[in-house]
Amino acid sequence: MVKVTFNSALAQKEAKKDEPKSGEEALIIPPDAVAVDCKDPDDVVPVGQRRAWCWCMCFGLAFMLAGVILGGAYLYKYFALQPDDVYYCGIKYIKDDVILNEPSADAPAALYQTIEENIKIFEEEEVEFISVPVPEFADSDPANIVHDFNKKLTAYLDLNLDKCYVIPLNTSIVMPPRNLLELLINIKAGTYLPQSYLIHEHMVITDRIENIDHLGFFIYRLCHDKETYKLQRRETIKGIQKREASNCFAIRHFENKFAVETLICS
């Protein structure tokens, strides 16, 4: 019978060989640690896709910011813009059935009729806003009028019909804002006696304007949500003019040293 024995010294030496050295650290890895940092490939978002989403978010925020700025500017202009001066005054003019060579302060008061209106002047924007209240004459309509010297346009809003009419600005009749402001100051101070004559201008309605955005801020504000039409001017004469058509309405106003009757016919 043979007895097999092991050298204990040799076994201890081999065991020591497998042990880490005193200056080294032993790394113990748990069995389930292999899959800790692994992810499902379907859950991984490509870098390019993340970058595209980032750009979309940036552009969306930029558009929202631009909309807020533009909307705020529009609301400020719509609600906070105030005219430089507001006047409520009138002008006297000779009746159509009376002929005088020149208006005179000595003429009897019965020979004159009076137009009163509310005038707002935006001198910096070169815009005049005229509000004609319900007149004492049955043959004239109340209206709001905008003269925009930047756009070179005039717009009439007939308050009886609730319709807008646009025509190129007639600078031979309409005073520039600064000159009109001086005239109103003189009338208010009493240095100018507003007794004058009546000018007739005859307009014909032509095409309907579907989009009024290009007509400028002030005309847009006047005519927004209103039926808006173009006008064509026939002729402007001083004195009496016979009304050719029954389908007409008149707006009497002034923005000069004389009164104007704007006759608009379909």
From Swiss-Prot:
Domain of life: Eukaryota
GO CC entries: endosome membrane; extracellular exosome; extracellular region; extracellular space; Golgi apparatus; Golgi membrane; Golgi-associated vesicle membrane; intracellular membrane-bounded organelle
Cysteine disulfide partners in this protein: C164-C223, C248-C265
Post-translational modification: The ectodomain C-terminal part of the imBRI2 is processed by furin producing a secreted Bri23 peptide and a mature BRI2, membrane form (mBRI2). The remaining part of the ectodomain of mBRI2 containing the BRICHOS domain is cleaved by ADAM10 and is secreted (BRI2C, soluble form). The membrane-bound N-terminal fragment (BRI2C, membrane form) is further proteolytically processed by SPPL2A and SPPL2B through regulated intramembrane proteolysis producing a secreted C-peptide and a BRI2 intracellular domain (BRI2 ICD) released in the cytosol. Glycosylation at Asn-170 is important for cell surface localization, but doesn't affect furin- and ADAM10-induced proteolytic processing.
Keyword field contains rRNA-binding: no
Residue numbers marked as site, Cleavage: R243, E244
Chain spans, region Necessary for interaction with APP and inhibitor effects on APP processing: 102-134
Name this protein carries in UniProt: Integral membrane protein 2B
